[in-house]
């Protein structure tokens, strides 16, 4: 087995990953797994750590944290271009860790590591976003779910919040605040050749099935089918949205009259309002944004 680089976000899940890492490290050592590791020290640090790992010749990089950590590792590993020689892995540890749900990995990090050490891989689709950030064009990859609207506003507010209370309390506070203040926004959305102009509560561009800590947002999504599943929550009242949320966990929201599901390989999103774009729960920029899919571009352990 080639040497593995493990990139650990010790503050993920309110510090639980940092507490679990010594046990995971001990497990890897007991199995004789050749590995190096690096601990992230600040937001976006995993991007540079993954890029440095590639520069040092590592071919297998595993993220131990949440979906945000995985997103950073993904972007660092492919900083110099999408490479078929790089194999990625993800160990659930963050508040959401939704991509590993789609992979079917155990929630326990040691059991998940034992599973991926079997060496099975699959080719999964890669999403690419082009948007604006601080007045310049920004490109970002994602592998699970991206989008805009309500969820992006919650993410933006949470990311700006002080970290002294961990991640859960600021998230719940900003979720409640956004529920009180958020209104549907006007969007222009182009799905391949189909153009929609409408007011929407949120727009989700999904490669994986889950987001938001187990919400079954795209039940029909497949990681390797070469297309996005786009879920649009059309203009609705706060009460309609609140009553819809429990259905998302069951996947039955897709039958709601104000939820529309589309398939597309290319998605354009724009608005006359300033709208944030999130990928794996991290704000990557603002609209206008273009989402493209690279079919089966990533070799992933599962």
Where is each model-derived feature located?
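ATP/NTP phosphate-donor binding region
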Residues: 1-64, 75, 194
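Short hydrophobic segments within beta-strands
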Residues: 7, 91, 231-233
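Alpha-helical membrane-targeting segments
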Residues: 26, 162-186, 235-259
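Catalytic core of DAGKc-family lipid kinases
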Residues: 31, 40, 79-201
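Short glycine/serine/threonine-rich phosphate/pyrophosphate-binding segments
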Residues: 46, 68-73, 98, 124
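Short Gly/Thr/Asp-enriched flexible loops that form oxyanion-binding sites at enzyme active sites
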Residues: 69-83
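Glycine-rich phosphate/pyrophosphate-binding beta-alpha loops
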Residues: 147, 151, 204-217, 283
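ATP/nucleoside-binding phosphotransfer catalytic cores, i.e., glycine-rich phosphate-binding loops
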Residues: 191-193, 197, 217, 222-223, ...
């Amino acid at each position: 087995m080639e040497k593995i680089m493990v990139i650990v976000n010790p503050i993920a899940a309110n510090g639980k990953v940092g507490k679990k890492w010594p046990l995971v490290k001990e497990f890897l050592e007991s199995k004789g797994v050749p590995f190096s590791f690096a601990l992230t020290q600040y937001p976006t640090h995993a991007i540079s750590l993954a890029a440095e790992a590639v520069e040092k010749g590592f071919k297998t990089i595993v993220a131990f944290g949440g979906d945000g950590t995985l997103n950073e590792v993904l972007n660092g590993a492919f900083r110099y271009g999408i490479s078929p020689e790089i194999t990625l892995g993800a160990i659930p540890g963050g508040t959401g860790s939704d991509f590993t749900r789609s992979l079917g990995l155990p929630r326990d990090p040691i059991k998940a590591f034992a599973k991926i050490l079997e060496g099975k891989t699959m080719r999964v689709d890669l999403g690419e976003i082009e948007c604006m950030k601080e007045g310049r064009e920004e490109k970002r990859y994602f592998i699970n779910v991206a989008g805009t609207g309500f969820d992006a506003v919650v993410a933006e507010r949470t990311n700006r919040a002080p970290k002294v209370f961990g991640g859960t309390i600021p998230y719940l506070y900003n979720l409640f605040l956004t529920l009180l203040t958020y209104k549907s926004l006007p969007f222009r959305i182009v799905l391949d050749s189909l153009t929609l102009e409408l007011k929407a509560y949120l727009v989700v561009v999904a490669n994986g099935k889950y987001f938001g800590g187990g919400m079954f947002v795209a039940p029909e999504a497949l990681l390797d089918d070469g297309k996005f599943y786009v879920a649009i929550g059309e203009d609705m009242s706060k009460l309609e949205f609140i009553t819809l949320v429990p259905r998302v966990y069951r996947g039955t929201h897709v039958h709601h009259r104000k939820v529309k599901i589309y398939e597309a390989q290319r998605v354009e999103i724009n608005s006359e309002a300033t709208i944030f774009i999130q990928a794996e729960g991290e704000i990557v920029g603002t609209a206008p944004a273009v989402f493209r899919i690279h079919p089966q571009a990533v070799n992933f352990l599962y």
